[in-house]
Amino acid sequence: MPTTPATATHSSSNGTAEAIMLELVDENGTTIGTAEKLAAHQAPGQLHRAFSVFLFDEQGRLLLQRRALGKYHSPGVWSNTCCGHPYPGEAPFAAAARRTHEELGLSPSLLAEAGTVRYNHPDPASGLVEQEFNHLFVGLAQTAPKPDPEEVGETAFVTAAELAERHAKAPFSAWFMTVLDAARPAIRELTGPSAGW
């Protein structure tokens, strides 16, 4: 398996390597422990905290990202603006803002909570499982993305109609439609009825 930001270890303040840890949660989203990131995604999967971000431009178009080919999980597929996992004890909102900046080089000019959704999506291609309690966020992107190529292969702003066309032709992450559908009420509130979300 290639070393990517997701599978790499990080140096702690004393110089030793630390594995990336995730918060394990119960069905209500209450923290019950921690697990190493890759282990939490191996079948059958462990329910853990995650976040998904949906950013829109002033025309109501959604910013999509195609995940970098070097990602250990779902490489090369299209997905929402940003998704990831808070570190243990990190607020999902803070993690969402942090990772959006790390992956896309932009800070949302507005970021609002849009609810939560729980799902279990096996990925047949990798054998990994997304078993997540996902915190949803919607917001505005008023600057052009500057993606980190280790994380993001490409970006695109799309209307609802363009998304439907792209989704019919190109591969998307297993979780994409689940998180999009769960976030739609907040997306409609943000973008207005004319955007068609």
Curated annotation (Swiss-Prot):
It catalyses: isopentenyl diphosphate = dimethylallyl diphosphate. One of its GO terms (biological process) is dimethylallyl diphosphate biosynthetic process. It is an enzyme of class 5 (isomerase). Its cofactor is Mg(2+); Mn(2+). InterPro entries: Idi_bact, IsopentenylPP_isomerase_typ1, NUDIX_hydrolase-like_dom_sf, NUDIX_hydrolase_dom. GO terms for molecular function: isopentenyl-diphosphate delta-isomerase activity; metal ion binding. It is found in: Cytoplasm. It comes from the Bacteria. Residues 46-183 form the Nudix hydrolase domain. The active site is at 83, 132. Its EC number is 5.3.3.2. This is Isopentenyl-diphosphate Delta-isomerase. It comes from Streptomyces griseus subsp. griseus (strain JCM 4626 / CBS 651.72 / NBRC 13350 / KCC S-0626 / ISP 5235). The gene is idi.
